[in-house]
């Protein structure tokens, strides 16, 4: 039986007390000091009457204190709810007002306080941290350990709920059970760049990987200025969104900085075109890893330089399922499809979500007999590599014909001059809906060439109504493309217009 989460982390910190856990500018926090912070938060939470099953919302910056608060609440068996930056006044009640007993925050604003309602407000400071109490792991396996809310870009944020059982079996939180591939990845996390938000499930699991492997989480003093932050802080591992990777590849500064310390650059969050992955492998070599996963499922597949060297078609894939992941491709009726056939990707692991918090309808649609539908479309080849082709629900119906935005995006990205491609559907009086494409290009690209690529790959009917060149793609707080904002930039572009620069 594995140690109940987060026992392995607490034991790991205690085993090497002098090793640095966090580095933030001139401040270095040792593992012993981090454990002391955890004990002080534990004391404060216990005095507030909190224990197993209680909801604790945590709203902090990326700091050692923020992580210590999360560990303390988890050790007590609480349901830890991350409050990410950027939530609107309308979204906050969906996050903080859902059965939360306490709010832990360093500087809560009026909107957050209003959303918290009757919950106890515990401000991080001398009073809360006055009396330490040794953390004793009290989590009950069947209880919810963590609720991570989605961006809410398509409506109210959905809370991805993981049990203590799932966290106990999680791929990154149990070093005694790490697979060979996880151990190899962790070896590169000596100095892990920690930025963005501690509410990100992805950032959390890789922070765990860093600390459990004896590494140091390095927090930049300001938003990271890629690529120079990698050289300045001697970073060995970093997560990247696709737009950040594009910046690294396209910035003249990348050739000017010393990146010899870098061992892992893991890109995930949205599709990466094969020719851009090829550029990244050429530039960064074995440090480059492309990952695929969901907040609901965790890390599912990885594509490495070693994979591409052994099987060149793998460049068009997102890698093979990790050893602890079961994966099937199914048709619309739920039947398993043979190798090479495209369908919806279903996965099963020991650490998938229990469901969406207080949302039984969405949960029932997502989980069937322990299997989770990703709502992504793809196929597996004979060597087990997964190829993504679109989103099961990201459809645009033009003249009663269904088109997948992801498929059009991937077709546009085949053009060597296209660095990014995003497709959005919008109502159209003539065709019901119309597909509108937005591309970031390097050199000048002719509209006719882009239309020809889509027509060749998918047929004339899939060619977007408009193609707009943009300098950069707006992103959501999660780092994913903000397609709503892209559509707003289109303004009054008519379906017959040619490529427009914005």
Where are these regions (language model features)?
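Conserved pre-ATP/AMP-binding loop-to-beta segment of ANL
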Residues: 18, 131-149, 155-156, 182-192
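Conserved AMP-binding/adenylate-forming core of the ANL superfamily
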Residues: 2, 18-49, 55-63, 71, ...
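Conserved AMP-binding/adenylation subdomain of ANL enzymes
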Residues: 171-191, 199-237, 251
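Gly/Ser/Thr-rich phosphate-binding loop
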Residues: 236-239, 251-312, 326
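Conserved AMP-binding A3 loop
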Residues: 30-32, 145-172
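AMP-binding/adenylate-forming catalytic core of the ANL superfamily
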Residues: 103, 349, 354-355, 365, ...
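AMP-binding/adenylate-forming catalytic domain of the ANL superfamily
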Residues: 459-480
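Conserved structural elements of the adenylate-forming
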Residues: 35-43, 160-184, 195, 213, ...
């Amino acid at each position: 039986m594995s140690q109940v989460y987060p026992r392995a982390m607490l034991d790991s910190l205690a085993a090497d007390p002098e090793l640095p856990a966090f580095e933030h500018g001139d401040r270095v926090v040792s593992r012993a000091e981090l454990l002391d912070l955890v004990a002080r938060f534990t004391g404060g939470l216990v005095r507030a009457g909190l224990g197993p099953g209680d909801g604790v919302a945590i709203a902090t910056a990326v700091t050692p204190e923020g992580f210590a608060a999360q560990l303390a609440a988890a050790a007590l068996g609480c349901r830890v709810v991350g409050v990410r930056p950027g939530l609107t006044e309308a979204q906050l009640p969906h996050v903080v007002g859902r059965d939360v007993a306490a709010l832990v925050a360093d500087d809560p604003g009026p909107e957050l306080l209003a959303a918290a309602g009757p919950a106890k407000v515990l401000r991080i400071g001398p009073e809360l941290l006055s009396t330490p109490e040794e953390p004793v792991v009290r989590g009950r396996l069947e209880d919810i350990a963590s609720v991570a809310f989605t961006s809410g870009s398509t409506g109210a944020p959905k809370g991805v709920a993981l049990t203590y059982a799932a966290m106990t079996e999680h791929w990154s939180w149990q070093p005694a059970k790490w697979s060979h591939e996880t151990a190899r990845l962790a070896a590169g996390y000596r100095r892990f760049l920690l930025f963005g938000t501690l509410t990100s499930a992805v950032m959390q699991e890789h922070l765990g990987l860093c600390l459990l492997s004896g590494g140091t989480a390095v927090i930049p003093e300001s938003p990271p200025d890629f690529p120079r932050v990698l050289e300045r802080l001697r970073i060995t591992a970093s997560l990247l969104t696709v737009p950040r990777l594009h910046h690294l590849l396209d910035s003249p500064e990348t050739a000017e900085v010393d990146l010899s310390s870098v061992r892992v650059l893991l890109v995930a969050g949205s599709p990466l075109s094969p020719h851009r992955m090829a550029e990244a492998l050429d530039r960064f070599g074995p440090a480059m890893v492309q990952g695929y996963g969901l907040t609901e499922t965790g890390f599912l597949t990885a594509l490495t330089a070693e994979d591409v060297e052994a099987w060149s078609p793998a460049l068009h894939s997102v890698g093979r399922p990790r050893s602890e992941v079961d994966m099937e491709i199914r048709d619309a009726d739920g039947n398993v499809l043979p190798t090479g056939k495209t369908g919806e990707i279903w996965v099963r692991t020991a650490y998938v979500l229990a469901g969406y918090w207080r949302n039984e309808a969405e949960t029932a649609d997502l989980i069937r007999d322990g299997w989770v539908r990703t709502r992504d479309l793809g196929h597996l080849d004979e060597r087990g590599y997964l190829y993504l082709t679109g989103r099961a629900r990201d459809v645009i119906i033009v003249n009663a014909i269904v088109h997948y935005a992801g498929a059009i995006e991937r077709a546009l990205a085949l053009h060597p001059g296209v660095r990014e491609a995003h497709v959005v559907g919008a109502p159209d009086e003539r065709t019901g809906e119309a597909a509108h494409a937005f591309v970031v290009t390097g050199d000048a690209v002719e509209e006719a060439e882009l239309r020809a690529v889509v027509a060749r790959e998918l047929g004339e009917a899939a060619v977007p109504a408009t193609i707009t060149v943009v300098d950069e793609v707006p992103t959501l707080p999660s780092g994913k493309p903000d397609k709503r904002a892209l559509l707003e930039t289109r303004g009054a572009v008519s379906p017959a217009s040619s490529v427009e620069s914005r």
